[in-house]
Amino acid sequence: MTTEPLEDPEANSNFVHGLPEASLGNKADENSEDLPGPSEGLDPLPDEVPPEDIVEARAEEDVDQASEANIIATEQDEEQASMQIATSMGQNKDRASMQTDTSTGRDAEPATSMTTSTSGVKEEIPGTPNPSQENLEELTSLLPQDPGILQMFVGFQNPVWDRLAENNRTSRSRTVSPSDSQTQEKTSGKSTVSEGQLEIASNADVPSVLPEDVQTSAGATDPPPSDTTGPEPEPTKSADQEAEDFKALNPESKVRSPKSTSEDLAADSGTPQAPPSPNSPADSPPPSPDSYQVSLGRSRLDPSLYGPEVENDYMRSMTSLLCGGEGSISSLTDILVWSDTATRMGVAMGILASGRSSPADRLQDEGPRLRTVASLFRSARSAFSSGVMAGTSSVLRSVTHLLESVERHTMEGIRSTMRYLNHFTLRWARTGSNSD
């Protein structure tokens, strides 16, 4: 019979590390060494009562097995708990980093990062399963799947796209609005721009939606990280380029030079010049041309909007008062815009300065010329001074009359008093002569 050593270092080390097989074998060997007799097993003899050492050894063996089972279960629970904690912490870190990267990517490269991640997820989902398939499914649940919604979201979040849209609208309004204003102001006799040319011009403009290769390029859409002031504005078009664009859009219309005359403006715009009034005097100047000369691209005044709808005596009298004739008022600007040689204000001032009984007597007369502001001030000052002097002289005359009346009454009172006293003195003289 061979026996093993009592203390085996390998068995002890295996027991420490949680291996139950070696420890159980060592315990069985130790118990077999303590048993008397030649038998190697633990079973007692059938005819004899098992000794107390065997019972105690079996009890210790049961206790050791139970403790080892508890230790193994505890270690397994701890390992599972640590693995779950590590897994949850790793998932939280991955989710946090993923969310941080996603938010940073939205600000820096929204179109590229989101389109790439969506395409990568769509490519990996139909393929063979891999260990990171669950994480990819979580990523796809966070990201939008509809490409239309993705493009709409990118367009609202990216400031570069907003600036591109504003530049497109500016260029569109700058190139199309002059043609629209010209087509609205042309008369029925003039030929207008066809709808096909307008469609070609609108298609020739910068497209509002760029191609997909431009949308996915990060260098074309996003500014560099060092650029904090934003992209530089696009250089504005020169006057020659704008004239060429306008001529390309409207081939029938002529490009006007800045030094175009009023006749060219009137011929191009189709607005007839206001003819001079037939009843106006010969020396009356024509209406001011400033009311009909307007710059390129500005709206023109329509004299029919300011004319009277119904002819009446009041308007005819006002026209004759201001213009010196019996015609109606052609435009509001004819009344508001006056020159130095016009006679409208002069007629009114002549009516005020004349001594006629009725203003109707002055309607057929020309009246004086329009005087300067200095002459008006001088006349007003002379009128004021004359009024003040007239008022002062009237006051002085009234005071003089009052003083004269007071003096006259005083002198009359003094005379009556002297006569009364003279009468008494005569009576006293008579009584004295009679008493003597």
From Swiss-Prot:
Its main location: cytoplasm. It comes from the Eukaryota. InterPro entries: DUF4678 (IPR031460). It comes from Rattus norvegicus. Residues 273-289 have a biased composition (Pro residues). Keywords: Cytoplasm, Phosphoprotein. Residues 81-103, 167-195 have a biased composition (Polar residues). Residues 1-10, 45-54 have a biased composition (Acidic residues). One of its GO terms (cellular component) is cytoplasm. The modification Phosphoserine is found at S375. The gene is Tex44. Residues 1-142, 165-307 are annotated as: Disordered. This is Testis-expressed protein 44. It is found in: Cytoplasm. Residues 234-247 have a biased composition (Basic and acidic residues).
